[in-house]
Amino acid sequence: MFASSVRVAGGQDQSWMFGPFEKPAPVNPVIAPRSTSTFRSPMNDSTVLWEEYATFNPGAVVRGGKVYLLYRAEDASGDKEIGHHTSRLGLAESSDGLHFTRRQTPVLYPDRDRQASYEWPGGVEDPRIVESDDGTYILTYTQWNRDVPRLAVATSRDLVSWQKHGPAFAKADSGRYMRLETKSGAIVCRVNGNRLVAARINGKYWMYFNVPEILVATSDNLVDWTPLADAESRLVKVLTPRPGYFDSWLVEAGAPAILTESGIVLFYNAGNSGRYGQEGLPARMYTGGQALFDARNPIKLLARSTTPFIRPTEEYEKTGQYKEGTTFVEGLVPFDGRWFLYYGMADSRVGVAVWDPHGSAVKSPR
């Protein structure tokens, strides 16, 4: 498909899966740190180089014939430990899905607003984007105050101006989940042209979330969410690590989940254990997996990949903040007849992998 590309190891090992994806080597990474972007932080009234240290973990959406990425950017404040910098969300656009132009300032960031105590000093992290039926963009992201990570929701009509709605589970069960560590919200969507539109199943919207096990939540309005719990108030785990496999250490919800003819395909990030993981795969390496859930019962697991469909193979995926290597999947869009997967490289850069489904045996999204 590309003059110079890398076929992703693992690929597609079951017919319901998306892939195989190829990494177009000449363009990767598509976004890297930049030391010329300045921003006046409203939190301490200082000018910061807001994307100087790292740019990674993007959400993606197609709007007006272009691909837009919301990506996590870190400044160089704090020490050199992961999670010890301040994160803000930048916006980039592309007419081909491969070459991006960035805005000079972030579009979502810690501000002197009602969310400040949840978002400062760690910032806003790891965006995922879907649309509602009326075209409103629904953003899930992590609020990080360096105490408790909280999954939060924001909405926008134009991807630039965002309304923060606060922690996703603030109203659930009289606030009992406000101290629960939550992150990584992947909302179930249907494909409508180049749009991924949040889908109702049994009258509710559904979202897979969290790490090291994947949980599930429902909503009536895409803003206020309630985690699914059993009769004893234990949160329902729908995907857990597997000894002996690439996902033996942890599993974490990835890009938005997609309704297909086969069921709901959930893309997830997976960590390998050094003691009881997959042989030949480095300890603590992050790869990508896919899981299939019943379209009428989103907590019923039908199948899951036995090997990673994407994994670190290139030097730029194994050098940076996370030296064990990551291909952290968060953004996926249908565009120009293909599927573009956007992912974080070693917590430092943004990469892309592309799948052309023409002629593939995989069942089509619906």
Predicted features and spans:
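Beta-rich carbohydrate-recognition and catalytic domains
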Residues: 2-122, 130-249, 258-322, 336-366
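Short glycine-rich, acidic/polar surface loops and turns
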Residues: 317-319, 327-330
